[in-house]
A protein has these predicted regions:
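Helix-loop boundary and gating motifs at the non-cytosolic
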Residues: 3-60, 232-264, 268-271
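Helix-to-loop junctions at the C-terminal end of transmembrane segments
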Residues: 65-79, 281-295
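Helix-loop junctions at membrane interfaces in 12-TM secondary transporters
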Residues: 98-111, 314-326
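C-terminal membrane-cytosol helix-exit motif in multi-pass small-molecule transporters
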Residues: 156-168, 186-205
Length: 357
């Protein structure tokens, strides 16, 4: 198996670099800005954390309901690119507008919209893996996607960090600094979306029906009825639902949790920057291991590691402990996400990848 990426594989990986800027912002700067907005309007510290977690949970629920429908619709011929581009652009547009709301509630509504659009774009994006590479290359390409996503997102993040941490020395308000950060990351997201949109062609698809929207529900029902015939797929989905929720909870809530404990803001942001840097070689290591080790076994190792990380996080109340958490998460975050994506892509029907993802 050749190691060099094809042009299409590289352009697919570019989207990981683009959208990762948004999710890094969500995990770092965004909770701090929401804390600033809510506290300035009299929201108690413990309520700030609750509202933030409610918003994250609600966005997850919306995606859980809309994702299967949108993914199934994307499997029809020439639908995948259109749906992907729409979701990505809506997410980037919402991100660019984050600085506008002065109300913490309006900000949360916009955040939910952006998070939902981002997550729906990922469903379609992940399903493209079957179109852009071969089965034997899926583990390596998926892992490299996450690896370059982590390191690529560091560029707009560092620039944003300079403005957010030094806005007063630059003679600007925090809101102006945030505006620059949000727009910069939105432009970055769009810029790394366009190469894939330009070159991607849907290789596996289902021929359009007379009423694709209505037939989407019929296909979903038919797939669920065949669950017993696809035990491997649905057993993995059942396990994935639980373990990936734990992974994303740690990613999404780390900064908000640290802020609520009163840990130093600059230290939190730099620690999470370290997570991205550590995740780059760690994800590439998983790509190398996947060539000689069973993918399912590597996923199990990462799950056990995350379980231990979560146990450590329960008692976390010191700055240095947060740094240990950041490094530990970086070691396994990319591996568990990348290999889960590629493993699932291998065991599902190629022409129904959107529906299954």
């Amino acid at each position: 198996m050749k190691n060099k990426l094809t042009k299409l594989e590289f352009k697919w990986i570019c989207y990981d670099m683009g959208n990762s800027a948004f999710i890094l912002l969500v995990a770092t700067i965004l909770p701090i800005y929401f804390n600033y907005l809510s506290s300035s309007q009299g929201v108690a510290e413990h309520n700030y954390l609750s509202y933030w977690s409610y918003a994250a949970s609600l966005s997850t629920l919306i995606v859980a309901l809309a994702g299967p429908i949108l993914g199934t619709l994307a499997d029809y011929k020439d639908h995948k690119k259109k749906i992907f581009l729409t979701c990505a652009m809506l997410g980037a547009l919402a991100l660019a507008c984050f600085w506008i709301p002065s109300s913490w509630f309006a900000f949360l509504v916009l955040f939910i919209a952006a998070k939902v659009a981002y997550s729906l774009s990922l469903i379609v994006y992940d399903s493209m893996l079957t179109d852009i590479t071969t089965e034997e290359r899926m583990d390596a390409v998926s892992s490299k996607g996450y690896a370059w996503g982590y390191i690529g997102s560091v560029v707009p993040f560092i620039i944003s960090l300079v403005f957010v941490l030094m806005y007063d020395k630059m003679g600007m308000t925090l809101k102006t600094a945030m505006m620059i950060a949000f727009i910069l990351n939105a432009v970055w997201w769009i810029a790394f979306t366009l190469p894939l949109v330009k070159s991607y062609k849907q290789k596996y698809y289902i021929e359009p029906e007379a009423h694709p929207a209505l037939d989407t529900f019929a296909r979903l029902k038919d797939t669920l009825m065949k669950a017993k015939e696809q035990k491997k797929v649905f057993l993995f989905l059942f396990a994935f639902f639980f373990y990936i929720d734990g992974v994303y909870t740690i990613i999404d809530m780390a900064t908000a949790y640290g802020t609520s404990l009163g840990l130093n803001t600059t230290g939190l942001l730099l620690a999470l920057l370290l997570t991205q840097i550590v995740a780059f070689p760690a994800s590439l290591t998983f790509a190398v291991l996947s060539k000689t080790k069973d993918t399912a076994s590597l996923i199990k190792v990462a799950i056990i590691a995350y379980f231990l990380i979560a146990l450590f996080a329960v008692q976390l109340d010191k700055q240095w402990e947060f740094w240990i958490l950041a490094v530990a998460v970086g070691c396994f975050q990319g591996g568990i996400q990348a290999l889960s994506r590629s493993y699932f892509a291998k065991i599902i029907p190629e022409n129904a990848s959107g529906e299954y993802f």
